[in-house]
Amino acid sequence: MPAEEVFAPQVEKIGKRTVLLRAFALPRGDEAMAAVRAIESAAPFRHMITPGGFTMSVAITNCGAFGWTTDRRGYRYTSADPATGKPWPAMPALFTRLASAAAGAAGFPGFAPNACLVNRYAPGARLTLHQDRNERDFSQPIVSVSFGMTATFLFGGRERRLPTAKIALHHGDVVVWGGEDRLRFHGVLPLKGDEHPLLGRERVNLTFRKAD
């Protein structure tokens, strides 16, 4: 993504190898949401089942060569949407550029994601503390992009029992973590608060990873 196309973000270091880029994706909000709607038309959002039999409150879809899925058999990446048997929608070029640029700004040059998990939160939806461990190469960072309602991001340590920081993520904010922070626990508190002018009472999160 050319430098002149990127809004100059406020950079906050929230870990040794974790950076919060305030408003980094703000100029691309409308375009990104149009891309999400196109992805949804090919691979609709759904509430997946965890291996423990619980229904996730967050609605999920994917784009890219691989999509993250969960059911009673476990967490994993698949090249096809289990609901249709068809490949996941291709990752929009905008998404690839945005994720690569954010990773570069956070000190992880050359990031080339091949999986984008799209999470949609309604009020009350949450994401419990977890680690991203289904990828083969932990040397690659995680890039998380927020749109819509403000959410409270929980960022902990490498063990679940360790304290968590609570960080407000607003429309257009991007969090990037990797290196020694790559396996830190993280989550999202139940969504609440004021509606957003663009998305209403909804939050959409794009999580970019290198799955293989």
Task: List each model region and its residues.
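Non-heme Fe(II) oxygenase metal-center motifs and adjacent flexible, charged/small-residue loops
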Residues: 1-212
